[in-house]
């Protein structure tokens, strides 16, 4: 299934249209929610507010990673300059990512998805797995083992956040430290500088769990992982609002549509899915309702 076989040229043009206003709103909303959550922890320190942040911040961290991903595709803003600068300095570096190496590795994922050459296969090809194996992965994520492993990999230059691609830049860690210095300074100006540790603790624990769930939701236990048809090798999760807020921000749950037309901005993906349904292109494609169903599918019976 190819875009020009299903959609008219006018429909494709409309879907591919980028909006700087929508892009900036997504970026600003993410950071406003981040600062608001950290302010709440500082204003009312306690177990409940810390737990609230531990649950809410991973979605904001993933939101930044998704926006980096969009910028890497050149589909977030209208201009390459904005995609490169905002994608790197405002979205990637705060989450210890690197736009350039990520985009390089992600291009290969799109090119080879549905084949043995997909570089991201190790993230999901083993599923379904036993319940005990899944719980072991969760323990590593939630106790910080996965996050600390990522930090070691970043320091050695062997990978970047959300990608196995070598970043190859001796300045990347320095840039990440610089951006986090600015982040700490901004928090300190509000009198809540110590909440940076809440951000980092969340990043190293619950965020790792959310990233794993995203990977499983997108490609694990699909109809046919080795078929080039995106309807078979990739999944969209039709999730309720609360799950999208906590686990799948910025329409990242519309992953099948993203693979179908990678240039469509994330804010246009729901419209793309609606059009595909109207045209019957998704007839017979299994509907996955929520990430609870994803987790059930990920466990071997």
What are these regions (language model features)?
Residues 58-68, 100, 146-151, 199-228:
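Transmembrane alpha-helical segments that form the membrane-embedded catalytic/substrate-channel core
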Residues 232-251:
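Cytosolic juxtamembrane regulatory segments of multi-pass membrane proteins
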Residues 1-57, 67, 92-197, 201, ...:
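Non-catalytic, topology-defining segments of multipass membrane proteins
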Residues 37, 72, 76-77, 226, ...:
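Active-site-flanking alpha-helical
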Residues 64-73, 102-114, 214-221, 248-264:
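Histidine-centered catalytic micro-motifs
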């Amino acid at each position: 299934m190819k875009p020009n076989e299903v959609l008219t040229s006018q429909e494709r043009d409309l879907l591919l249209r980028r909006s700087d206003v929508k892009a900036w709103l997504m970026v600003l909303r993410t950071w406003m929610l981040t600062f608001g959550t950290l302010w709440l922890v500082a204003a009312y320190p306690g177990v409940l507010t810390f737990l609230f942040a531990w649950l809410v911040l991973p979605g904001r961290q993933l939101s930044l990673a998704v926006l980096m991903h969009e910028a890497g595709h050149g589909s977030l803003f209208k201009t390459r300059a904005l995609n490169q600068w905002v994608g790197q300095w405002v979205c990637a570096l705060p989450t210890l990512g690197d736009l350039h190496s990520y985009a390089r590795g992600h291009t290969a994922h799109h090119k080879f998805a549905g084949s043995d050459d997909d570089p991201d296969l190790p993230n999901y090809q083993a599923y379904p797995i036993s319940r005990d194996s899944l719980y072991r992965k969760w323990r590593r994520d939630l106790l910080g083992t996965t996050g600390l492993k990522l930090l070691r990999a970043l320091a050695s230059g062997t990978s970047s956040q959300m990608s196995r691609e070598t970043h190859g830049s001796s300045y990347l860690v320095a840039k990440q430290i610089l951006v986090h210095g600015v982040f700490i300074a901004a928090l300190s100006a509000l009198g809540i500088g110590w909440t940076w540790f809440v951000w980092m603790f969340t990043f190293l624990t619950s965020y790792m769990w959310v990233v794993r769930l995203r990977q499983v939701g997108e490609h694990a236990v699909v109809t046919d992982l080795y078929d080039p048809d995106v309807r078979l090798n990739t999944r969209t999760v039709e999730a309720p609002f609360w799950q999208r807020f906590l686990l799948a921000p910025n329409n990242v749950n519309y992953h099948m549509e993203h693979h179908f037309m990678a240039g469509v901005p994330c804010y246009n993906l729901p419209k793309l899915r609606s059009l595909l349904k109207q045209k019957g292109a998704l007839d017979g494609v299994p509907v996955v309702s929520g990430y609870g169903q994803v987790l059930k599918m990920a466990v071997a019976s």
